[in-house]
Every structure is written in structure tokens, then in C-alpha cells.
């Protein structure tokens, strides 16, 4: 999993096929098994397959996941969950939500927990968990249909995998960034939180210094809009460049950690077990409460 591959994954939503092929040229894929999840037309997909073959790829496998299954709702019932749910949301894209999802998965698995997970990237199956269903982004379905369908989708995962904890990554942002970049109006986060009730919510922010007033206002926003309060704030290393605010695609720059004291987490906290211990303590309290 090289930096070049990571660049393709991060940018494929707005890269042209020529840019994708150029990026793939940099990858050392000879004699390797290549997995891909196609979100292209058949001609562009074939171009990528041909390039991989010409570069000596050992095998090329199209990933087929639960996210490819068509939306289906058998009844208008919202099922309750017996498993604690940890959700990762963000104020926007490029707030390192996926890094957080991988961090949580790794730490919980290392501690011996059985984890089920639905992530924000279309290639989550490469990391042995489910991608967000495609119909969550399909405008032909109503919000109501998506709420019931996601509830049933996650319930099937719980019944089949029998996890001890479920991790959900919420795509896009919870609110619009500006008039140009609406970030789906936060609808996906609203639909997910209407379908399930997270027991622990991590909110990822753009890089910057934040006041307690801002954090309180953000918590009130999720409390009344998503019906869940924020347990932790995470400050990412990315910040949108002001020169791209009104352009078709925003550009992000990498920045070092800002000073926010102990009230916010950042990438350095992933190097210790303080954060994961806090999460486990909260989930343990949840389990004890359920038993009582």
C-alpha cells in the first residue's frame, strides 16, 4: 500500500482517467495481486485492467461487497442494537476520518475485541470490513428509504458477525462548508444517526485552534440535529486553502498540530493508549448499564 496508491484513492473522485492511469504507472505492481472496486464506466475500467496486465500484475480481482447489494426494505421497522456503536464523523472531507476508523479498528482488535465495521471509503474491503452501501449516495431513493435500509443493513451485520463493538464512519461532512461546497448538506450523517444511535461519537475537525464556545456550539448542533452528543473532538492535520473556497474542488494543505490543550485529541494521541482506554471505559459503562 504505497503513497502513490494512497494518492489515487484519495483523489479518484475527481481525477480524470488519464490522471488515474498516470498515477498507476508509478505503482510497483508486477507479480502482485491487484484488488479494485470499479466506480468507472466499462471503457475506463478496461483501460485500468489492461495497464495492470501490461505491468505484470499477477492477478486482478474486482471487489464485490455488501455495499454493492441493492437497497431492500422488508418492513418499516427500526431495529435496536445489542452491540455498542462507535461513530466517526467530521465537519468536512479531508479531516482524517478514515485514519481514525483504521486506528480504532487496529486498537480494538489488538485488545481482543470482535469488531464489525462500515467505513467511509469505497475500498474498505481491502481492510476486511464493509464499505458504505452505494445506495446511501443514490438520489433515486428517499431519505426515509435509506434510513430503514441502513438500519436493516447494519442489523444483518450484527446478527451475522456477532461483534462486541461496531464502528461506523460517516461520509462527507455533517454541515455544508459554504454555498459552493455543500458536502451533501450533512444528509448522510443525518440518515445514519436516524437509522442507528451511536453510543460514542468522535467529531473530526479541520486543523486549527478552537475555543470552548465553538466546541459547545458544535456539540449542541449534533445533539439537536443528529440526536447524539460528541464524546471526543479530533483535530486533523488538514486545512482547506482559502483560495479554493469558491473553486469546483477544494484544495487542502497539511499543517502541523495546533495548540489546543488537553480538551482535543490529535494524531499524537494515537501513539499512546490514553484515548482508546477512555473509549473502552465509556463502552464498559454502557454494557454495565444495559445489564442493570
Enumerate the predicted regions with their spans.
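Walker A (P-loop) phosphate-binding motif
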Residues: 71-118, 215
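Glycine/threonine-rich flexible loop motifs
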Residues: 10-20, 176-182
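Short, flexible helix-coil linker/hinge segments at the edges of structured domains or between repeats
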Residues: 52-88, 120-142
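Conserved catalytic-core segment of NTP-binding enzymes
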Residues: 36-53, 60, 66-68, 148-149, ...
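N-terminal phosphate/diphosphate-binding loop that engages ATP/GTP or pyrophosphate donors
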Residues: 103-144, 219, 223, 245
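Short acidic-hydrophobic, aromatic-tinged amphipathic segments that line or gate anion-handling sites
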Residues: 59-63, 262-275
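Single conserved hydrophobic/aromatic residue that forms the stacking wall/gate
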Residues: 1-5, 9-12
Amino acid at each position: 500500500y504505497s503513497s502513490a496508491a494512497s494518492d489515487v484513492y484519495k483523489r479518484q473522485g475527481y481525477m480524470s482517467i488519464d490522471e488515474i492511469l498516470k498515477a498507476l504507472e508509478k505503482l510497483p505492481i508486477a507479480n502482485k495481486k491487484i484488488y479494485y472496486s470499479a466506480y468507472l464506466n466499462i471503457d475506463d475500467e478496461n483501460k485500468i485492467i489492461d495497464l495492470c496486465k501490461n505491468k505484470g500484475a499477477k492477478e486482478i480481482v474486482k471487489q464485490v461487497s455488501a455495499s454493492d447489494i441493492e437497497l431492500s426494505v422488508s418492513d418499516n421497522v427500526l431495529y435496536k442494537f445489542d452491540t455498542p456503536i462507535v461513530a466517526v464523523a467530521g465537519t468536512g472531507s479531508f479531516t482524517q476520518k478514515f485514519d481514525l476508523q483504521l486506528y480504532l479498528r487496529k486498537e480494538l482488535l489488538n485488545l481482543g475485541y470482535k469488531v464489525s465495521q462500515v467505513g467511509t471509503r469505497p475500498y474498505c474491503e481491502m481492510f476486511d470490513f464493509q464499505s458504505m452501501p452505494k445506495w446511501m449516495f443514490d438520489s433515486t431513493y428517499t431519505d426515509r428509504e435509506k434510513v430503514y435500509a441502513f438500519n436493516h443493513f447494519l442489523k444483518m451485520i450484527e446478527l451475522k458477525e456477532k461483534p462486541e463493538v461496531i464502528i461506523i464512519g460517516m461520509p462527507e461532512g455533517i454541515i455544508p462548508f459554504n454555498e459552493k461546497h455543500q458536502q451533501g448538506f450533512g444528509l448522510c450523517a443525518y440518515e445514519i444517526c436516524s437509522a442507528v444511535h451511536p453510543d460514542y461519537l468522535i467529531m473530526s475537525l479541520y486543523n486549527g485552534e478552537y475555543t470552548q464556545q465553538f466546541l459547545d456550539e458544535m456539540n449542541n448542533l449534533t445533539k439537536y440535529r443528529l440526536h447524539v452528543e460528541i464524546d471526543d473532538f479530533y483535530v486533523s492535520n488538514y486545512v482547506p486553502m482559502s483560495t479554493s473556497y469558491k473553486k469546483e474542488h477544494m484544495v487542502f494543505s497539511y499543517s502541523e498540530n495546533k495548540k489546543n490543550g488537553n480538551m482535543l485529541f490529535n494524531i499524537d494521541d494515537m501513539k499512546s493508549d490514553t484515548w482508546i482506554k477512555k473509549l473502552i471505559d465509556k463502552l464498559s459503562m454502557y454494557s454495565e448499564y444495559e445489564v442493570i
